[in-house]
A protein has these predicted regions:
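Canonical P-loop GTPase G-domain recognition
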Residues: 116, 126-186
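Helix N-cap motif at beta-to-alpha junctions
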Residues: 224, 276-277, 356-362, 404-408, ...
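A short, contiguous, amphipathic alpha-helix enriched in charged residues
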Residues: 312-335, 549, 553
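Short glycine/threonine-rich beta-strand-turn micro-motifs
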Residues: 160, 346-361
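P-loop NTPase switch module centered on the Walker A-proximal segment
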Residues: 1-93, 97, 137, 206-209
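Long insertion/accessory domains within large nucleic-acid-processing enzymes
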Residues: 253-261, 393, 439, 449-568, ...
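Conserved nucleotide-binding/hydrolysis modules and their immediate coupling elements
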Residues: 200-305, 315-317, 480, 489-539, ...
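Interdomain boundary/hinge elements
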Residues: 31-33, 145-157, 191-202, 239-253, ...
C-alpha cells in the first residue's frame, strides 16, 4: 500500500506507529525516538518527506508492504512511479485542514490507476478538528476526480497518528491500530502475480551505494528470482533495449531496512544489485520470455536554474568540491536517483542547466550538495515555456491560501499584481478565509517572504502545478533594490553604520565582502553602491574607540529559499558549505553600468 497525504498531515508519524505496532522493529531503531522513515537530515529538519520509503509490517500472517510517498508536488516524480508498485492507497487527511492541493494531485494519480482506497481522517484530537466537514470534502473531491462507485464507498477510519490509535466511529476513541490493519486487509487485495510464470519485474526506483553500485527497487509481477540468476533488461518506451546481466545481491524490505535474501517471489517488493546501467522504468525479465511492462511517463520539469562553478573573489576557500567536473559528476549521480530532474550542458563548459518540478525541488538539491561540501553559484529560477501554434505557453499553479480575514485584502492585492485570478473563496469559521487562485508559476517566485509579511506569519499557502496557459505578460517579482558593495575587504562597523541609513543590511561587522556583492536591500527599487569597508581616518582628536558607540540594527540572515526568492535577474547566489552570498553577475561597477546602459 502507498500512504498519500498533504505535507505535514502526519503520514510518516502514522507509519512509525504501524511499525511499532507490528513489533518487528530492530533494537537499534528503538533508540532513535521518532520518525524512523525520515532518515535524511533535511527531511527531519523540514518535516517533509522527499524520497519514497519502503518498509514492511507483519500483521497476523500477512506481510504489509508500506510505501511512504512525498506529499509535496515538487517531488511528484517520486509519487507517480511509486504507485506502480502498490495494490491500494491509504489516503490520510488532516481533521482540521481538510483536503489540500497536493492531496488532490496524488489521489488523482492513484484513481487513474484504479487502485483500492482506504481513507483515514488523522489528528482527530486537534481542538479545531472539523471531522464531518472533512468527510464531505473527501467525498466531493473523489466525485470531482471521477472515482468509481467502489472507490466512493471506501471505508473511512478516524486516527490519531501521534497516539497510534484508529477507530471506525468518530465518537468512539480508538485504543490501538488493529481497526486500521483489519480494514487494509479486507479492502486491499493482495498482489495477483503468478509465481510459476517466467520472471518479470518493473524497476520503480533506484538507489546508489558506494560498495555495490546501482541498486534497483521494484515489485515482482510474476515468477521467482534467485541470487546469481541471469536476467534481461528491457524497456516499454525503448523497444531496442535488450541488456543481459546477473543479480549479484537481493534484498527484502523489513521494518526499517533492507535485509539480504537468497530468493524472492511474485508480489514482493525487493531491491537488487548487479546491473550497473539499470534505470527507472526498465523491466527485468527471464531470458526465456522478454516482455517489457508498461510504465507511466513522468511529467516534464517546469523550472530551470543554471548551476555553475563559483568564480567570486572568495571562490575555493570554503568548499571541498569546487571544479566543474566535480559538480557535473554530482549532478549525474543525482540523476540516477531522481527521475523528475534533468541536467543539460550549457553554452559554457563550467555551467549546467538543471531542470526540476519546482523551486523547492531544486533548492533541496542545492542544500544537499552544500552539506556534502560542494561550492557553486546558481542563477535565479526561470520557468520552462512551450510554444504551441506560434503562441508561448507557461506553467500555471493552483494556489490555495488560508488566512485570517483581516489580511485577506493584502493577499488579494499582492497576488493580483502577480497575475493571479481568484477562482473560489470560502469562509473557515468566523475569523479565517480560504482563497483559491490560478496564476503563472513565475508569479510565485519571491512571493513567500511578502506573504509572511502581509499575513503577519499567520497565513498558510499551498500550490500545485495546474497545466499550461498562454504567457500572462510581465510580472515584477521584486520591489526592492540592492545595496551593492564597491570595495573588497572586511565589513566594519563605521562603514555598515553609514550603509544602513540607505537600506536594510544582510551582513554584519567582520564578514568578508567583495566588489559587486549584495550586502542589503533598499526600499526605493534602485540599486545603491556603498562602501562597508570604509574606516574612519584617525587623528589625535578622532579615536577609533568612539566606533563602539555606533549602533547597528540587528541583521536577519536569509535561508537558502529566502536567497533564491530575493535574487534579481542580474544576480547570482554563491553557495558554499559555510555561507550564502548574493552577488551581481557582473562584479565590476563600471562594466555593470555599461551593460545596463546598452540594455536601455
Amino acid at each position: 500500500i502507498a500512504i498519500i497525504a498533504h505535507v505535514d498531515h502526519g503520514k510518516t508519524t502514522l507509519v512509525d506507529k504501524m511499525i511499532l505496532a507490528g513489533n518487528i522493529l530492530r533494537d537499534n531503531a528503538k533508540q532513535t525516538g521518532e520518525l524512523i522513515l525520515d532518515n535524511n537530515d533535511l527531511e527531519r529538519e523540514r518535516g517533509i518527506t522527499i524520497l519514497s520509503k519502503n518498509v514492511s509490517v507483519i500483521y497476523k500472517d500477512y506481510k504489509i508492504n508500506i510505501i511512504d510517498t512525498p506529499g509535496h508536488a515538487d517531488f511528484g516524480g517520486e509519487v507517480e512511479r511509486v504507485l506502480k508498485m502498490v495494490n491500494g492507497v491509504l489516503l490520510l487527511v488532516d481533521a482540521a485542514e481538510g483536503c489540500m492541493p497536493q492531496t488532490r494531485f496524488v489521489l488523482q494519480k492513484a484513481l487513474q490507476q484504479n487502485l483500492s482506497l482506504v481513507v483515514a481522517i488523522n489528528k482527530i484530537d486537534r481542538p479545531d478538528a472539523r471531522i464531518k466537514e472533512v468527510i464531505d470534502e473527501v467525498l466531493y473531491l473523489l466525485m470531482d476526480l471521477g472515482a468509481t462507485d467502489e472507490q466512493l464507498e471506501c471505508p473511512i477510519l478516524f486516527c490519531c497518528g501521534r497516539d497510534g490509535t484508529a477507530s471506525l466511529d468518530p465518537d468512539v476513541p480508538g485504543t490501538d491500530l488493529i481497526p486500521l490493519f483489519d480494514t487494509l486487509l479486507s479492502t486491499i487485495k493482495p498482489p495477483e502475480g503468478d509465481p510459476e510464470a517466467p520472471f518479470q519485474m518493473l524497476v520503480s526506483s533506484v538507489d546508489y551505494n558506494e560498495f555495490v553500485g546501482r541498486i534497483g527497487i521494484g515489485r515482482i509481477q510474476n515468477g521467482v528470482a534467485k541470487v546469481g540468476e541471469e536476467v534481461v533488461v528491457c524497456d516499454w518506451h525503448n523497444p531496442d533495449l535488450k541488456m543481459r546481466g546477473r543479480l549479484t545481491k537481493l534484498y527484502d524490505f523489513q521494518a526499517n531496512g533492507r535485509q539480504p535474501c537468497d530468493n524472492i517471489t511474485a508480489g514482493d517488493i525487493v531491491a537488487f544489485s548487479g546491473l550497473p546501467d539499470v534505470t527507472i522504468g526498465n523491466t527485468l525479465c527471464s531470458p526465456s520470455n522478454v516482455e517489457p511492462l508498461p510504465f507511466v511517463k513522468i511529467n516534464d520539469p517546469t523550472v530551470e536554474m543554471t548551476f555553475s562553478v563559483n568564480d567570486s573573489p572568495l571562490a575555493g576557500r570554503e568548499g571541498k568540491f569546487v571544479t566543474s567536473r566535480q559538480i557535473r559528476d554530482r549532478l549525474q549521480k543525482e540523476l540516477l536517483k531522481d527521475v523528475a530532474l534533468k541536467v543539460e550542458d550549457s553554452a559554457t563548459t563550467d555551467s549546467f542547466r538543471v531542470m526540476g518540478r519546482g523551486e523547492m525541488h531544486l533548492s533541496i538539491l542545492i542544500e544537499t550538495m552544500r552539506r556534502e561540501g560542494y561550492e557553486l553559484q546558481v542563477s535565479p529560477p526561470h520557468v520552462l515555456t512551450k510554444v504551441i501554434d506560434g503562441k508561448t505557453y507557461e506553467p500555471m499553479e493552483h494556489v490555495v491560501i488560508d488566512v485570517p480575514t483581516q489580511y485577506q485584502g493584502a493577499v488579494m492585492t499582492g497576488l493580483g499584481q502577480r497575475k493571479a485570478i481568484l477562482q473560489q473563496m470560502e469562509s473557515l469559521g468566523s475569523d479565517r478565509v480560504r482563497l483559491e487562485f490560478r496564476m503563472p508559476s513565475r508569479g510565485l517566485f519571491g512571493y513567500r517572504n511578502q506573504f509572511l509579511t502581509d499575513t503577519h506569519g499567520e497565513g498558510i499557502i499551498n500550490q500545485i502545478f495546474d497545466g499550461y496557459d498562454v504567457w500572462a505578460g510581465m510580472i515584477a517579482n521584486r520591489s526592492t533594490g540592492s545595496l551593492v558593495s564597491f570595495e573588497t575587504g572586511e565589513a566594519v562597523t563605521y562603514g555598515l553604520f553609514n550603509a544602513q541609513q540607505r537600506g536594510t543590511l544582510l551582513v554584519g561587522p567582520g564578514e568578508k565582502v567583495y566588489e559587486g556583492m549584495v550586502i542589503g536591500y533598499t526600499a526605493s527599487g534602485e540599486d545603491v553602491d556603498v562602501n562597508v569597508c570604509k574606516t574612519k581616518h584617525l587623528t589625535n582628536t578622532r579615536s577609533s574607540g568612539s566606533d563602539d558607540a555606533l549602533r547597528l540594527i540587528p541583521i536577519s540572515k536569509l535561508s537558502l529559499e529566502g536567497c533564491l526568492e530575493f535574487l534579481a535577474q542580474d544576480e547570482l547566489l554563491e553557495v558554499t558549505p559555510e555561507n550564502l552570498r548574493i552577488r551581481k553577475q557582473i562584479l565590476n561597477h563600471d562594466q555593470r553600468m555599461k551593460a545596463k546602459s546598452k540594455l536601455k
